[in-house]
Amino acid sequence: MSEIPPSHPRYISLITREKLVQAVHEGIVAYEGLTSHGRGEAFDYLLGEKTSPSGLNAEKLAARVLLAAKHPVLSINGNTAALAAKEIADLQKASDAEVEVNLFHRTDERVKQVSKVLEDAGCVLNKGIVERCIPLPHDRGLCDPRGIGSADVVLVPLEDGDRCEALVKMGKIV
């Protein structure tokens, strides 16, 4: 990892980027995940790099919905695992939600790598059967029918949105 002084005005951003680059080398994050992160960071710049009041309200509402769910599932991709595995483990404990790995650029090896990062952080993973439960023409449609497939609430921390739209059409709260 590069030596980045904490006084640098983009310190958190640069450290985050370095973590993702390292995760690419470890097989956790797909190369395309770096582009996804950059798109998200662009919005962060536009929003002044702080959580807006409406964003904070949305976070609080999401937490209440997750806690009230009958069958909540946290759907985790490589970027989320690389950047927030410990926080996902803490959220799982607080919400009693299942954690399921769901990858757009899916290989058995990446699923194993992402799973290991999450388990090392304390997550208990749903490693059930995988089949196409979500009507999408790519691997994000693959999930466990007893996990994401039957969840009433699915937390999707980082994603472009087509799967979120499909999950909502299936009657899930996303």
Give short role names for the model-derived ranges.
Residues E98, K172-I173:
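Proline-centered loop/turn at the N-terminus of a beta-strand
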Residues N77-K86, H105-E109, E159-R163:
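Gly/Ser/Thr-rich loops at beta-strand to alpha-helix junctions
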Residues D90-D144:
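Long, charge-dense
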Residues V65-A69, R146-D152, V168-M170:
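Flexible, charged surface loops at secondary-structure boundaries
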Residues P72, V154-L155, I173-V174:
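Short, well-ordered beta-strand core segments
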Residues Q92-K93, L167-G171:
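Short, conserved loop/helix-junction motifs that constitute active-site signature segments
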Residues M1-E100:
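Electropositive, gly/pro-rich neighborhoods at or near active sites that engage anionic ligands
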Residues V130-E165:
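Active-site glycine-rich loop that binds ribose-phosphate moieties when present
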